[in-house]
């Protein structure tokens, strides 16, 4: 594992290069030919309707599931083709926050958090204690280390799971629906915590979520799975100003669009919905935001997020290739330098 730099922060996390990835369960194709580069040291979000294989994708990235085609390059190693020993070593780069926290019910929070250190390192118990207490303090659980998972709230279990994901100083952090089971207030706290962690260790973070507010305000990059394919992946500014129908529908939580209750809609259904909309029928959904919603910033006193400058440089290079309307909205955002913290922008 890389050493901490002179500014007290870990070096930038590593990139993840996915090429031509295809996964099936028996005769059921989950997704095919998925290709994307997840930038190092940035926060990315993967969106998509239920059943599109987002969690399957996450599990594939750490080698828990094996796609039948394609490659996943992490720190120069293809984890699909590498040996079991190489995969074991690559996994030490990862910290994973599972959807349910995945805590051991028979262990208190201290032992749950210490588990990866005892399994993957030869550190003395005194060293383990220092690390565990530091991570629990980081996620706001200092003083709760003797409590058991059954004695605490769902939000606290999420934070305990995040503390455990951080104990090996990972360069890549995967979060599987971190907001699942949380109310909007706890979700806002968790969003702020993720941004603060990225500022401190510059890790590569990938979040799978259905939460529209997280999608709009947290990530540097966004991607969306639909119809067994990756529809788009890129900087937040590009997707938030995109006219791609499925992206617009999902980000605004509308019924009107290609996504149906259980499957994609046919053209006649979409035409009927469009007619209802033109007739003044209110279709529900989230408040539609014009332009680019501001991104959550770090808590005052934290280091600046290096990811912001890297992403904005890529966006400026892409501007000439984007539609005029998107260019104007993105330039307004870049020049306006919109910044806020999670508690200032709720659901």
Curated annotation (Swiss-Prot):
UniProt superkingdom: Bacteria
ABC transporter domain sequence ranges: 16-252
Signal sequence extent: none
Nucleotide-binding keyword on record: yes
Coiled coil: none
GO molecular function, one term: ATP binding
Assigned keywords, A-Z: ATP-binding, Nucleotide-binding, Transport
Keyword Glycosyltransferase attached: no
One Pfam short name: ABC_tran
PROSITE patterns per the UniProt record, alphabetical: ABC_TRANSPORTER_1, ABC_TRANSPORTER_2
Gene3D superfamilies tied to this protein: P-loop containing nucleotide triphosphate hydrolases (3.40.50.300)
Residues reported in the UniProt entry to bind ATP: 48-55
Family per similarity comment: Belongs to the ABC transporter superfamily.
Entry function: Not known, could be involved in the transport of ribonucleotides.
Name under which the protein is recorded: Probable ribonucleotide transport ATP-binding protein mkl
Species annotation: Mycobacterium leprae (strain TN)
